[in-house]
Amino acid sequence: MIGDLLTGTLAEEIAATSIRVFVPTTPATAVAARAARLLGLERLALAEGFTALAGAQRDWATDVFTLLQRGLLGVAVTPVQLDAAGRTNLSGIGPPGRPKVALIGPRGLPDNNDTPSPLWYLVAQHSPRTLVGRVDMVCGAAPSGAGLRTLLSPAGCFDLLEGRWHARWLAPGGRALIAEAPAFPIEVAEGTPERAATSPAALEALAAVDPEGTRLAEFGEG
């Protein structure tokens, strides 16, 4: 299942960092963060809204910005649009001021998109509607390269390096999906590996924290 592949990969990615706080934004990203604890990042605190922080906490308004600038706060987002330069859109589809569809707004993306802290973009479809040449509205500016920026999609895992997307690995059928979004170019080097499933350890962690499989609904599965 693509949901397990991407959620499990995100869990592995989070567990491999030294972040102290993770901000989940969807059910799948919350499951991934809990699984990351079982994969080795036991003391990871989860920020789950304005009134909930799982883990030891201090009531100090500037802490979030300190963590961001020190590379210690991880975020995974599901943008409405993500473009070839890494700009993100959560506000609307169509011309600024007269969008065809108005959405929830940028929330913390203006602060998160270009910091030393890691940021993952998790999209359920590798679609030309989501992955575009330039976003309709910039909610998060193009990253400068200060921190890890990774896209996880049904086509595979892709890193933003020096303003260009590069394939780390491809999911089965990934090349065809990349070709269907030509405005969002991805460099696929010769010998790029294919990955059809996440690790057994990640699958076990997902099952432990999400036995009902709620993560899969985000990907139209389950």
Report each predicted region and the residues it spans.
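N-terminal active-site beta-alpha-beta segment that forms phosphate/nucleotide-binding
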Residues: 1-61
